[in-house]
Design a protein with these regions (language model features):
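Acidic, metal-coordinating helix/loop segments flanking the phosphotransfer/catalytic sites
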Residues: 57-75, 82-85
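C-terminal output helix
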Residues: 131-140
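Non-catalytic signal-transmission and effector/linker regions of two-component phosphorelay proteins
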Residues: 1-47, 51, 141-157
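Conserved phosphotransfer microenvironments
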Residues: 41, 74-94
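Conserved phosphotransfer cores of two-component systems
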Residues: 69-71, 93-100, 121
Length: 157
């Protein structure tokens, strides 16, 4: 197994994986991912890396509050329930920070009503976990394309 690196704010930790999370294609664009399960983090990190993004792992809404204003944030992917909150709080923090960072929510229990609620509250999309990594990559790429089309003058934060 190869060693790969997940990036934590102000720190880094290594995780073993079959493929490296970073391939040098990210050009400084970051994706914040909020998850509490290490297996989920690994799966999402690899998918985001394949989208050309540098995955930055967070596990709490408090960590998000301190990181969201940093430059290069292109997209945010979050688990439905976190250690100190949930996706609704993540959406509020993202909206309050300004900018137009697309938020993709994933849930183990997602149903149609939850999907509609997440989108109504401002999520770009809500995926049921486990999902295929290709599905997540497609949603993230679509979110980035729509953000570029809607806000062409906005620099990535």
């Amino acid at each position: 197994m190869k060693e790969s690196t997940l990036f934590y704010p102000g720190d880094e930790a290594t995780h073993s994986s079959n493929s490296a999370l970073r391939h040098g294609r990210n050009e400084g664009r970051k994706a914040l991912m909020l998850a509490i399960d290490p297996g989920v983090s690994q799966c999402i990190g690899e998918a985001l890396d394949r989208c050309g993004l540098e995955p930055v792992l967070l596990s709490t809404v408090a960590e998000l509050r301190s990181c969201i204003r940093k430059s290069g944030i292109s997209v945010l992917v979050c688990e439905e329930v976190l250690l100190d909150g949930n996706y609704k709080e993540v959406l509020r923090v993202s909206r309050a920070a300004g900018g137009h960072i697309p938020v993709v929510v994933f849930s183990r229990l997602a149903d149609w009503d939850q999907y509609m609620e997440a989108v109504r509250l401002g999520a770009f999309d809500c995926l049921r976990y486990p999902f295929r990594t290709g599905e997540l990559r497609w949603v993230v790429n679509r979110a980035l394309q729509e953000r570029s089309a809607e806000y062409p003058r906005e620099k990535e934060r």
